[in-house]
């Protein structure tokens, strides 16, 4: 497990998070990539942050979980950058993504946030 991963995300929660990201991408607003995700978290605009566990070097996303926790934003860890990128609508992998406006996935994002709070 990478240094920046605070807790083990259950597979079903990771899958629900990726599905919520896909719905938010189509009906709301998402930010893709480490830089855009970091800006969204710093501004307090993000409702949910998804970070891949296979990022190398780890320092690229190491700051995100701590920053999101300071802002009260739930963070979900998924296995690969390809999963994050695909769910965010990219043809390539992405180390991180943020849901800004959940759109039709609003209830799912809220429920995911509650489950993440229980895991921490």
Swiss-Prot record:
It holds the Pfam family Ribosomal_L7Ae. GO terms for molecular function: ribonuclease P activity; rRNA binding; structural constituent of ribosome. It is found in: Cytoplasm. One of its GO terms (cellular component) is ribosome. InterPro entries: Ribosomal_eL30-like_sf, Ribosomal_eL8/eL30/eS12/Gad45, Ribosomal_eL8/Nhp2, Ribosomal_eL8_arc. Keywords: Cytoplasm, Ribonucleoprotein, Ribosomal protein, RNA-binding, rRNA-binding, tRNA processing. It comes from the Archaea. Belongs to the eukaryotic ribosomal protein eL8 family. Part of the 50S ribosomal subunit. Probably part of the RNase P complex. This is Large ribosomal subunit protein eL8. The gene is rpl7ae.
């Amino acid at each position: 497990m990478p240094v920046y991963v605070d807790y083990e995300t259950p597979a079903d929660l990771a899958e629900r998070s990726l599905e919520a990201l896909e719905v938010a991408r189509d009906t709301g607003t998402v930010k893709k990539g480490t830089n855009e995700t970091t800006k969204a978290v710093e501004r307090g605009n993000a409702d949910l942050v998804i970070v891949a566990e296979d990022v190398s070097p780890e320092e690229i996303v190491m700051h995100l979980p701590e920053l999101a926790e300071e802002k009260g934003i739930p963070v979900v860890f998924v296995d690969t950058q390809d999963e994050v990128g695909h769910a965010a609508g990219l043809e390539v992998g992405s180390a991180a993504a943020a849901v800004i406006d959940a759109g039709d996935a609003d209830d799912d994002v809220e429920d995911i946030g509650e489950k993440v709070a229980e895991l921490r």
